[in-house]
A protein has these predicted regions:
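Short coil/turn segments
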Residues: 45-47, 101-102, 130, 138-143, ...
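Hinge/capping helix and adjacent helix->loop/strand transition within the periplasmic-binding protein
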Residues: 61, 88-94, 109-196, 208, ...
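C-terminal lobe and pocket-closing loops
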Residues: 215-283, 312-315
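Bacterial N-terminal signal peptides that target proteins for export
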Residues: 2-16
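N-terminal signal peptide c-region/cleavage motif recognized by signal peptidases
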Residues: 24-26
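An extracytoplasmic/periplasmic, membrane-proximal ligand-sensing/linker region
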Residues: 35-37, 181-184, 268-329
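N-terminal (or domain-start) structured segment
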Residues: 29-120, 159-161, 167, 182-210, ...
């Protein structure tokens, strides 16, 4: 019995030391985070405002973290490809997802099924920006304002076309919502990304597109005509362009929120470090200036704030999709 007691005592001591060493190792690993570059997956092709915004925050988060934050564009399938990549990545903080109201709003609302859960498979880090889309058309469209465009579209069903970044994209959803709200029939033409879609509008092959602050030089040069913004207030980048509400399309306000998330299960200490870096980046004057130029309004805040924004977007866009009879694909 005595020998057995000594054996158990030694076993307990060895086990206790092992646990201490394990806890110490995990603690040290988290304290040293990050010790290598971080990948920020953007589920869009290069060139769109989401890509531009992601590169801005990545640059300034790199400075705050002392490690490069590298943008990895994984566009396609209405953001599903990039989202699934991150959802199935190791939960160690080294693979992040740039999220917005499409990844966690319009896309789930327009999808029959998904290979991942947009809420349970991701851990919110921080809200970043919000902006409003702007309805743009090729100058060949003769209408001078939204009401004239609506009248023309009703008299000429399917003659006007709307370029989208793909089925289930924000362009697709907002365009479908506009058709439903106004009773028009503007035909959607899907592309693989916002860049190719915009090029065909500029070339006159497609009538219209929903754009953002990146389009300001094109509007100023007369290459695109700006009709209305889809936000709650006028866009500071386009102060002379009315909102949809001001233009007589009542209840049409769909601001697009941006944030960063990680795979579910990422350690709390790692999430806290990333949240602090994101909020530090948002305070930088250079970032704030660039955001203003693009029409990006700065959010900032806690993981809980982003979770709230995501849940509100999911509920809002699901309700709109149902009421507007927007089909699931």
């Amino acid at each position: 019995m005595k020998i057995k007691s000594i054996s158990l005592g030694r076993t307990f001591s060895i086990t206790f030391v092992s646990v201490l060493l394990s806890v110490s190792f995990i603690s040290n690993a988290q304290e040293k985070f990050p010790n290598k570059p971080i990948k920020l997956v953007v589920p869009y092709a290069p060139g769109a405002i989401t890509d531009t915004a992601a590169r801005i925050i990545a640059e300034h988060m790199s400075n705050a973290l002392g490690q490069p934050v590298v943008v990895d564009n994984r566009g396609g399938a209405g953001t599903r490809i990039g989202m699934q990549l991150v959802a199935t990545s190791p939960a160690d903080g080294y693979t992040l997802l740039y999220v917005n109201s499409i990844t966690h709003g319009t896309m789930p609302a327009m999808s029959k099924s998904l290979a991942f859960d947009p809420v349970k498979d991701f851990a919110p880090i921080a809200p970043l920006f919000w902006y409003a889309n702007i309805f743009l058309c090729n100058p060949s469209v003769s209408a001078k304002n939204i009401q004239e465009l609506i009248t023309f579209a009703k008299q000429n069903p399917d003659k006007l076309t709307n370029a989208t970044a793909g089925p289930g994209s924000g362009h697709d959803f907002i365009g479908s919502f506009f058709n439903s709200m106004t009773g028009v029939k503007i035909l959607h033409v899907h592309y693989k990304g916002g860049g190719p879609a915009l090029q065909d509008v500029l070339a006159g092959h497609i009538s219209c597109i929903y754009g953002d602050g990146n389009a300001k030089p094109l509007v100023d040069a007369g290459k695109l005509k700006a009709f209305a913004t889809a936000g709650p207030a006028r866009d500071p980048v386009f102060p002379n362009v009315p909102t949809m509400e001001e233009s007589g399309v009542k209840g049409f306000s769909l601001p697009i929120n941006h944030g960063i998330a990680a795979p579910a299960g990422t350690p709390a200490a790692v999430l806290a470090r990333l949240n602090a870096a994101a909020n530090e980046a948002l305070k930088q004057p250079a970032l704030q200036q660039r955001a203003r130029e693009l029409g990006l309004n700065i959010y900032g805040g806690s993981p809980e704030k982003l979770a709230q924004v995501i849940n509100e977007d999911l509920a809002k866009f699901a309700k709109i999709a149902k009421e507007a009879n927007i089909p699931k694909e």
